[in-house]
Amino acid sequence: MFEFAGAGASVLEGAARSPAFKRVLLGERGAELSFTRVGFTQSFFSDRPIELVSDGELKATAFRYETGVAGLRVQNSRSSMVVLPYMGMQVWFVTFDGRNVTQKSMFDMPLATTKFGDNYGAFLYHCGLNNVNGPEEGEDPYPMHDVLPFAVYENTYTGVGVDEEGRYLAVGGTYVFRNSQELYWAYAPELRLYEGKTMVEMKATVHNRRTHPLEYLWLCHMNWLGVDGGRFYYSAPQDPDHVLVAPTELGNDSPRAVAIREWGRKLASDPTLADVLDSSSQVYDPEMCINYRYETDEDGLAHSLMELPGGGSYYVAWDATKAPYALRWLCRTGDEDGVGIAVPSTGTNRGSSYQREHGHFNTLEPGESDVLRWRFGLLDERETSDAKACIDAILGR
């Protein structure tokens, strides 16, 4: 369903006639009908905002935070977010229909640093590709989630295009990793925001440029704002073959350590206790991870959502053929409130040695590429009902 196939004037007409769930959530996209590309460099960003694209409701505005970090604000009539092209293509301050959906943190703007924990306020981080997560005992050190979170991109661009889903604003670029005699690969993500939509479509091309096979790990860390009463629905069976709690151990007997240790034991016995957010009875201080191995629909897509008490839901879907796992990450400390509803991943929340031992690396032969695809956004009540029905069908309920 994510493949590009077909073109012509009838494409948009066909999309308008397709079933609502398929059109709104997982519309089959045809060939790109047109795209006007606007390249930019770091010199475009200053204290005075510059509008790089303005086409109806689709806008892209370059500016620079007082911390010196370059930001590109992209928006349509219902959605707004800031992409950091030279800081890992991180996505900050996402709003849909005026609702802030980004994790609560102590960071009111991105800081000019490459240390993960000193700048952890974004909605979205690309992670990998040599490693993911953090190094475990006995492993050589590597940065938290490796090089992608703070990668400096080249060939950066924005622009407006048309495909069978309609008109969209795109932002993208390419990061090239070179390590003499070892690694040579490129990672090229693109974000697409369509007119009138609260759904963002993303893809990332991984290209092995070396004459030897490339083994890579990948993860996309999307951090939503926690909402008490939020209820999780997901296309992973609730059994030990598909769900694994990773209890947090702080290594001491402080009240904080004891509280999360005890909660971790309860979750390990019954992971469904985490399926409805409740800050009065649950402990996610400092954080907790639950690993899920997802089942997919007929198109290879995994689905996960958090239904909101007031109606609607936060939603994530992705092509699980290259990323069969997803982490549910929870951090609710009072100062922070972040929930990774589904963090698509090639493997689990463990270090790289564990991933290798369990066969979680993807492999690309010389010159080959993979395309990773995923979507995230805000669903209304009808769309939420359709998504839940899709999940039920996958699980045979």
Set out the residue ranges of the language-model regions.
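Surface-exposed acidic/polar loop and edge beta-strand patches at domain peripheries
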Residues: 2-195, 199-201, 212-215, 222-397
